[in-house]
C-alpha cells in the first residue's frame, strides 16, 4: 500500500515543482512589487494566508513598497526535496529541523541557519494530539488505546511527512515512558502501526481521509490541525489530549542561495523575523499554534493543554540522530512497518 502512496506523493511533488518553476516565483516586478515564495508544510496554509496579509501591510507601511508572498504546502519532507531539486524559493517554514538540514547539505542554505532567529529559528511550536469522532465511540483516552483490536488509526507516512515523524516520536515517547525495554517499546509501536489503515503522504491528506472521507476511528494530528478541524466542523469531533506527547518545533530559514540570486535576502529575513512580533505571535495563538512568546502563550491557556508531559527532540539525540535511528531506510519505522 505504501508504494501507492509514494507514487502519488511523487506525482504531486513533480506537478508542484513544475508549477512553481514555471511561474518565475521570486524577485521584483516591473511595478516595483517584490515577490517572495515561502515553501511550507501541510497544515500551515490557513495561518500563512493570514500572516502574509499582515506582513504585506506592515512591509508597505514600513518601506512604502508592495510585497507579494506566494505560498506552497505539502508534506514537509517532500517540500524540502523539491527545494533541493530546483524549486526557486526564498524561505522555507518546514515541520522539522532535519528537513532544513537536508536543504543546507545541498549548499542552498548557509550553515548556522538554526541560530539566525530566536528559539533556534522556531517562532512557534505545537504538539501531537488524538482526534476522535463526537462521543468518542471507541473510548480513546491515551496512546495505549490505539493498539487495541478494531481501532483504525489514521496518520501520514514518515517517509514524506514531517508531521508523521512527530506523530511517531510522540507515540514512542509514551512507549518509552511506560516500557523499560527496547523490545517492549518496539512491540508497542508495531501494534500501533498495524492498526494504521491509510497512510497519506502529508498531514492535510490524513485529515481529509479522516474528516471528509470518514475513514478511521482516530486521527493522530498536529494540535493546530485538530483545533482547526474542531472549528470547521463544530459538534462533530473531540480532541483527546494524551498523557505524553512531544514538543514539536517547526523550523524556518532563508534559502540563502536563491534569495541572493533573486535579490530578496533582506526582505526574506524581515519576513521570518516578523513572525516573532507581538502581532504575529497573537495570530499564531489564534491559529492553533503555540507562541514562543510566553506572555502571549499564557493568553491561550484555555485553548492549549499545558499539562501534557512533552518530550523534547533532544531526548532522542537531536533530529539528525533521531532521523537515522527511526526514519532512515532500514531504521525502526521500516522494521516495524515493513517494506
What are these regions (language model features)?
Residues 1-12:
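Bacterial N-terminal signal peptides that target proteins for export
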Residues 31-33, 64-66, 78, 86-88, ...:
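Extracytoplasmic
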Residues 104-176:
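A conserved helix-loop-strand patch within extracytoplasmic ligand-binding domains
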Residues 259-339:
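Extracellular/periplasmic juxtamembrane helices and adjacent flexible linkers that interface
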Residues 178-243:
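Ligand-binding pocket segment of bilobal, Venus flytrap-like solute-binding proteins
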Residues 20-24:
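C-terminal motif of bacterial Sec signal peptides marking the signal peptidase cleavage site
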Residues 25-106, 116-117, 222:
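Early extracytoplasmic/lumenal segment of secretory-pathway proteins
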Residues 37-40, 70-72, 91-94, 122, ...:
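Structural recognition of the beta-strand scaffold that forms the well-ordered cores
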Amino acid at each position: 500500500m505504501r508504494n501507492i502512496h509514494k507514487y502519488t506523493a511523487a506525482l504531486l511533488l513533480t506537478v508542484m515543482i513544475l508549477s512553481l518553476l514555471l511561474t518565475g516565483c521570486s524577485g521584483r516586478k516591473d511595478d516595483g512589487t517584490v515577490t517572495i515564495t515561502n515553501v511550507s508544510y501541510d497544515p500551515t496554509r490557513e495561518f500563512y494566508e493570514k500572516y502574509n496579509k499582515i506582513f504585506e501591510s506592515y512591509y508597505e507601511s514600513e518601506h512604502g513598497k508592495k510585497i507579494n508572498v506566494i505560498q506552497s504546502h505539502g508534506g514537509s519532507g517532500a517540500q524540502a526535496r523539491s527545494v533541493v531539486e530546483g524549486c526557486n524559493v526564498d524561505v522555507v517554514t518546514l515541520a522539522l529541523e532535519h528537513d532544513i538540514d537536508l536543504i543546507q547539505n545541498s549548499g542552498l542554505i548557509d550553515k548556522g541557519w538554526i541560530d539566525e532567529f530566536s528559539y533556534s529559528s522556531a517562532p512557534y511550536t505545537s504538539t501531537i494530539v488524538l482526534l476522535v469522532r463526537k462521543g468518542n465511540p471507541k473510548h480513546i483516552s491515551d496512546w495505549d488505546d490505539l493498539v487495541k483490536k478494531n481501532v483504525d488509526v489514521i496518520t501520514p507516512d514518515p517517509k514524506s511527512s514531517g508531521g508523521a515523524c512527530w506523530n511517531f516520536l510522540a507515540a514512542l515517547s509514551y512507549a518509552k515512558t511506560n516500557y523499560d525495554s527496547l523490545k517492549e517499546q518496539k512491540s508497542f509501536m508495531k501494534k500501533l502501526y498495524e492498526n494504521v489503515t491509510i497512510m497519506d503522504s502529508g498531514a492535510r491528506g490524513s485529515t481529509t481521509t479522516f474528516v471528509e472521507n470518514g475513514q478511521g476511528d482516530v486521527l493522530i494530528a498536529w494540535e493546530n490541525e485538530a483545533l482547526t478541524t474542531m472549528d470547521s466542523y463544530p459538534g462533530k469531533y473531540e480532541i483527546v489530549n494524551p498523557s505524553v506527547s512531544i514538543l514539536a518545533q517547526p523550523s524556518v530559514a532563508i534559502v540563502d542561495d536563491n534569495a541572493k540570486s533573486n535579490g530578496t535576502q533582506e526582505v526574506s529575513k524581515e519576513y521570518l523575523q516578523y513572525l516573532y512580533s507581538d502581532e504575529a505571535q497573537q495570530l499564531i495563538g489564534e491559529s492553533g499554534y503555540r507562541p514562543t512568546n510566553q506572555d502571549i502563550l499564557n493568553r491561550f491557556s484555555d485553548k492549549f493543554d499545558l499539562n501534557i508531559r512533552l518530550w523534547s527532540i533532544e531526548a532522542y539525540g537531536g533530529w539528525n540522530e533521531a532521523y537515522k535511528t527511526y526514519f532512515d531506510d532500514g531504521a525502526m519505522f521500516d522494521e516495524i512497518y515493513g517494506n
